Amino acid sequence: MTKEFNYGTGRRKTATARTRLYPGTGVIEINGRPYEEFFPRKTLQMIIRQPLVLTKMLEKFDVKVNVAGGGISGQAEAVRHGISRALLELDAELRPVLKRAGFLTRDARKKERKKYGLRAARARYQYSKR
């Protein structure tokens, strides 16, 4: 039995994207909506397409993504990470290309926690000398 789709999980900040790649015509769907509708910003749309454009597979696959958590920027980058991992599952020879572009690296930066005695993670309360 052959697999009908390739799967990849992408993460960024608190966003998680579960990505499935089906052989198709280049339709990208996020949470049941077209990606242009889900991410109206052109920069975020470009981020999502990057791995497919880089590997010249934009018109060869339909992408279905379920994304949750985080904000729009984190979600877009999580989707990019997920698509890259799914492409890797499809063809392991794409690893050097995707790795060089930095699409396989999980961006581990997260929000720093607030510390007690401070106003935020590093910001202090205003100091009054007198």
From Swiss-Prot:
- Family membership noted in the UniProt record: Belongs to the universal ribosomal protein uS9 family.
Keyword NAD set for record: no
Q: Which PANTHER family match?
A: RIBOSOMAL PROTEIN S9, SMALL RIBOSOMAL SUBUNIT PROTEIN US9M
Gene giving rise to this polypeptide: rpsI
> Does the record carry Secreted as a key word?
no
NCBIfam families xref list: PRK00132.1 (NF001099)
**GO biological process terms, semicolon-separated:** translation
PROSITE patterns noted in UniProt: RIBOSOMAL_S9
Please give the superkingdom of this protein's source.
Answer: Bacteria
* Protein name stated in the entry: Small ribosomal subunit protein uS9
One Pfam family of this protein, by short name? Ribosomal_S9
**What would be one Gene Ontology cellular-component term for the protein?**
cytosolic small ribosomal subunit
> What InterPro entries would the database entry show?
Ribosomal_Su5_D2-typ_SF, Ribosomal_uS9, Ribosomal_uS9_bac/plastid, Ribosomal_uS9_CS, Ribsml_uS5_D2-typ_fold_subgr
Q: Name one GO molecular function term.
A: RNA binding
Q: Which UniProt keywords apply?
A: Ribonucleoprotein, Ribosomal protein
